[in-house]
C-alpha cells in the first residue's frame, strides 16, 4: 500500500466509536507528520462531529510539537532573538493563546518605550515605575511570571523577565544582565546596578560582591526550567512532557526516562 493510501485508511478509522481503535489510528497518523496538514485541512469540516474532534486533537498535537521544536531551535541558535524567544516561552505554557495576540502585546510595550528617553538607569527605573511593573522574586510557584503576555497584561512578572524585556527596548548600551546575592540586576557600562526587587533603586557593586553575568541563552534555559518545575509542582504531566521535550529538543517520551514514577511509567513505584 502506498503512503497516501495508508494515511487515507488511517483517517477512515477516525469515526470509529471504539476509542482504542481511534487512538491507535491517531498515533500512527502522527508518524506521518509532514503529510498530515493537507489531510487535516480536508477533514476539519467533516460532517461527523467525532471526526472533527479527533482531527482537532491531531492539529493540537502538531501545534505543540512545532512549539517545542521552535523554542529548542531558538535556544540553540548562535543569535537569540529576545522577542521571539519570549513569545515562544509564553506559548509553551499558555499553548491555547494565539501568537499574533501575544506578539501585539510586545509591540505595544516596545511602542510605549519609544515615548520615553531610555538612556540611563534612572530613565529605565522611571519608565518601569510609570508602567506600574511589579517585579517578583524568582519562583517556581508562579509560572505566569515567566510568560511575557501575562506579564504585560497584569504588569507583574519575575524580576529576571522584566529586566530582559527592559534591556531589549532600552537605548542605553551596553547593559548586562547579572545576578547579585540571588537577585537579578542590570549593570551599565560604569558598573552601576538597577535593582528591580529594591523598588528599582540604583546602586554600585560593593567590594567583595561578585556579580554573576547571564547571557540570553542562560536566562531562557533558566526560565524554561522554572516552568518545568512548576509543572512538576502542579503534577501536570502534559506540561512536564512539553517543557522536557522543548528543553531536550526531541518529540520522544525518552526525555522522561530520568524522572521517577509516575512520570516515567517504566519505573515501578517503590515503597517509602
Model-derived features: where do they sit?
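A structural boundary/capping signal
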Residues: 2-272
Amino acid at each position: 500500500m502506498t503512503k497516501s493510501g495508508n494515511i487515507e485508511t488511517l483517517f477512515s478509522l477516525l469515526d470509529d466509536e471504539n476509542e482504542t481503535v481511534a487512538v491507535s489510528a491517531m498515533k500512527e497518523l502522527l508518524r506521518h507528520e509532514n503529510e498530515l496538514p493537507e489531510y487535516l485541512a480536508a477533514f476539519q469540516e467533516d460532517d461527523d462531529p467525532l471526526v472533527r474532534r479527533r482531527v482537532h486533537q491531531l492539529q493540537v498535537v502538531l501545534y505543540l510539537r512545532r512549539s517545542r521544536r521552535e523554542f529548542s531551535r531558538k535556544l540553540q541558535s548562535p543569535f537569540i532573538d529576545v522577542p521571539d524567544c519570549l513569545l515562544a516561552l509564553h506559548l509553551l505554557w499558555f499553548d491555547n493563546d494565539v501568537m499574533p495576540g501575544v506578539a501585539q502585546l510586545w509591540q505595544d510595550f516596545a511602542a510605549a518605550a519609544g515615548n520615553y528617553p531610555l538612556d540611563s538607569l534612572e530613565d529605565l527605573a522611571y519608565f518601569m515605575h510609570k508602567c506600574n511593573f511589579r517585579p517578583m522574586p524568582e519562583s517556581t510557584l508562579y509560572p505566569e511570571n515567566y510568560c511575557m503576555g501575562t506579564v504585560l497584561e497584569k504588569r507583574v512578572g519575575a524580576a529576571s523577565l522584566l529586566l530582559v524585556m527592559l534591556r531589549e527596548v532600552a537605548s542605553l548600551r551596553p547593559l548586562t544582565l547579572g545576578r547579585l546575592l540571588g537577585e537579578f540586576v542590570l549593570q551599565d557600562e560604569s558598573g552601576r546596578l538597577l535593582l528591580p526587587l529594591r523598588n528599582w533603586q540604583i546602586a554600585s557593586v560593593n567590594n567583595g560582591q561578585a556579580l554573576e553575568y547571564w547571557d540570553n541563552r542562560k536566562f531562557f534555559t533558566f526560565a524554561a526550567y522554572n516552568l518545568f518545575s512548576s509543572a512538576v509542582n502542579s503534577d501536570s504531566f502534559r506540561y512536564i512532557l512539553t517543557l522536557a521535550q522543548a528543553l531536550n529538543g526531541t518529540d520522544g517520551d525518552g526525555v522522561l526516562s530520568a524522572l521517577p514514577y509516575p512520570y516515567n511509567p517504566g519505573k515501578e513505584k517503590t515503597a517509602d
